[in-house]
């Protein structure tokens, strides 16, 4: 029978140092998540009125509000959790390490889920929904919303198929009344913006998840080592 003691470091020092190091890296990556979430929220905040007027309000809300806010909240939670991880690892707090590891496991599942969803999301379907809503709102009394979005995205008309004079009348114009971004269609601009942000969120989620898994595994080894330590009964485990 294999003796698992042979696989563990002889002292907790060799586990504490990499755990603290990985948590420091994860803290920095938590900042990255906050920045990414903030950028996405800032970008999609311009679609608030568009989403409200759209016939696909629920679907668009998930893309423009729920997902970016979720990334931001996870980033904030991550920063707090990694600080706790550094403290309980350094002080060898057994109960603290157990709680930290459990929370890391939950966060790992959430991160991999978000990262995988972002990378595998059907971008064509999302763009199709936006396009349908774009045309719908362009032909409604709230078409000023489209002019604001086109000015923000620096484009004119959703696509070449919808570039007749009716749609061009909504395009942003300069002081002389000339169309600013003629022949620069919003479909291509939007697709590029959304794709880059989804890829960034997806890669960040997967990379952080992998590093987090290693930190969590080392924390489990540290818990086992503390429990097996001759001094474990004398420890301040709380």
Swiss-Prot record:
Sugar attachment sites: 62, 143, 164
Keyword terms of this UniProt record: Glycoprotein, Membrane, Transmembrane, Transmembrane helix
Side of membrane Cytoplasmic, spans: 1-16, 91-93, 219-238
Domain of life of the native organism: Eukaryota
InterPro entries given in the database record: Tetraspanin/Peripherin
Extracellular-side positions: 38-69, 115-197
Pfam families for this protein: Tetraspanin
UniProt topology in membrane: Multi-pass membrane protein
Keyword Glycoprotein: yes
Compartments where located: Membrane
An individual GO BP term: hypotonic response
Keyword RNA-binding found: no
Gene Ontology annotations for the cellular component aspect, listed alphabetically: contractile vacuole; membrane
Residues annotated as transmembrane: 17-37, 70-90, 94-114, 198-218
Family stated for the protein in its record: Belongs to the tetraspanin (TM4SF) family.
Protein name: Probable tetraspanin tspC
Source lineage: Eukaryota, Amoebozoa, Evosea, Eumycetozoa, Dictyostelia
């Amino acid at each position: 029978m294999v003796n698992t003691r042979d696989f563990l470091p002889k002292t907790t020092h060799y586990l504490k140092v990499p755990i603290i190091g990985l948590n420091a890296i994860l803290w920095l990556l938590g900042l990255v998540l906050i920045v990414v979430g903030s950028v996405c929220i800032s970008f999609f905040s311009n679609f608030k009125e568009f989403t409200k007027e759209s016939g696909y309000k629920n679907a668009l809300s998930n893309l423009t509000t729920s997902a970016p806010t979720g990334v931001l909240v996870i980033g904030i939670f991550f920063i707090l959790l990694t600080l706790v991880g550094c403290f309980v690892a350094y002080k060898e707090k057994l109960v603290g390490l157990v709680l930290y590891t459990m929370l890391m496991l939950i966060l790992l599942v959430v991160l991999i889920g978000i990262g995988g969803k972002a990378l595998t999301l059907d971008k064509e379907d999302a763009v199709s929904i936006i396009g349908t809503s774009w045309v719908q709102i362009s032909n409604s009394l709230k078409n000023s919303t489209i002019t604001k979005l086109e000015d923000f995205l620096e484009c004119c008309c959703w696509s070449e198929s919808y570039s007749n004079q009716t749609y061009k009348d909504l395009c942003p114009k300069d002081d002389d009344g000339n169309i600013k971004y003629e022949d620069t269609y919003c479909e291509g601009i939007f697709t590029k913006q959304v794709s880059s942000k989804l890829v960034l969120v997806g890669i960040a989620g997967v990379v952080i998840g992998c590093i987090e898994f290693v930190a969590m595994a080392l924390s489990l080894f540290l818990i086992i080592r503390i429990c097996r330590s001759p001094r474990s009964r004398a420890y301040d485990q709380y």
